[in-house]
From Swiss-Prot:
It comes from Bacillus subtilis (strain 168). Disruption phenotype: Deletion mutant lacking both trhP1 and trhP2 shows reduced 5-methoxyuridine (mo5U) formation in tRNAs. Belongs to the peptidase U32 family. Involved in prephenate-dependent formation of 5-hydroxyuridine (ho5U) modification at position 34 in tRNAs, the first step in 5-methoxyuridine (mo5U) biosynthesis. The lineage of its organism: Bacteria, Bacillati, Bacillota, Bacilli, Bacillales. This is tRNA hydroxylation protein P2. The keyword Hydrolase applies.
Length: 309
């Protein structure tokens, strides 16, 4: 039985080696000009350094090129993708067909992973993009376990799912927070380093707090809870899911390292010793709950809910 890749989104190049030592086998990085909702901002120099560190340790580096592109940016894609290929990244993650077209012209040997956040909901669509050149499909977070397994059974490409972290609920290209501050006569710095400013939308009826931040790609509203299925990995591993992702957006490096250690142990035991995996489930959940940020509970997302599509 194969072990799935353990993919983590690091906050900086300083995270790469500690996360590899914690058990990560792949990383998703990028810069906000081309990628969406990343845990950290990786310049070209950072990407090159991340590849150097990861490859030395036998890990992979993927770069997010999954932003919503308008005419003003499409002319840059070819040159950026050529840089990624030259830097030796293991794949570019895309959603916009413009990236696929640019890659064919400027970086034909660069491996591509297809990810659109919400529309990876069936194996026909996954296979369509596979036949267009994608080696992997990243599934929507709103799918339940049965749907994920069925997709994997019929997929012609690798399948990636998110197993831990917050998920995006809303994105607008508009500067909603900046406009609100401007209306109040205030100034807001929307640089990437300011996104951990602790702003929330408060739903009093459900008593939920939704993290909200703004960057070059607009305004993003995130889920009030973190997905955590460390105790529900059996069916996914048995199905042969290729990659498990821990999303580190709005998380501290120390948190990511501890969670990665636990998922590494869980994956290894689930493959090698099911009885011991079963025995340790409660301990992992308790340990994760003990390091969760204030007011952020964990749940199983849509894995055991009726699919909303």
């Amino acid at each position: 039985m194969k072990k799935p890749e353990l993919l983590v989104t690091p906050t900086s190049t300083a995270d790469i080696l500690p996360l590899i030592q914690a058990g990560a086998t792949a990383f998703l990085v990028g810069e906000q000009r081309y990628g969406l909702r990343l845990a950290g901002e990786f310049s070209r120099e950072d990407v090159t350094k991340a590849v150097e560190i990861a490859h030395k340790e036998g890990a992979k580096v993927y770069v997010a090129v999954n932003a919503i592109f308008h005419n003003d940016k499409v002319g840059e894609l070819g040159e950026y993708l050529a840089f990624l290929a030259e830097a030796g990244v293991d794949a570019a993650v895309f959603g916009d067909p413009a990236v696929l077209m640019a890659a064919r012209e400027s970086a034909p040997d660069l491996k591509l992973h297809w990810s659109t956040e919400t529309t990876g909901t069936n194996y026909y669509t996954c296979n369509y993009w596979g036949r267009k050149g994608a080696a992997r499909s990243v599934l929507a977070r709103e799918l339940n376990m049965d749907s994920i397994v069925e997709i994997k059974e019929n997929a012609e490409v690798e399948i990636e799912i998110q197993v831990h972290g917050m998920t995006c609920m809303f994105q607008s290209k508009r500067s909603l927070i900046g406009n609100y501050f401007e209306y109040q006569g205030k100034v807001m710095d929307i640089e990437r380093k300011k996104k951990e400013s602790g702003m929330f939308l408060h739903d009093k009826e459900r008593d939920n707090k939704y993290p909200i931040f703004e960057d070059e790609n607009g305004t993003h509203i995130m889920s009030p809870n973190d997905v955590c299925i460390i105790d529900e990995l059996e069916e996914l591993i048995d199905a042969g899911i290729d990659s498990f992702k821990i999303d580190g957006v709005l998380k501290m490096p120390e948190y990511l390292i501890e969670v990665t250690k636990m998922y590494r142990e869980a994956i290894d035991l689930c493959v090698e010793n099911r009885d011991e995996y079963e025995a340790k489930k409660e301990d992992w959940i308790e340990r994760i709950e003990s390091i969760q940020p204030v007011n952020r509970k964990i749940d199983t997302g849509f894995f055991f809910k009726e699919t909303v599509y």
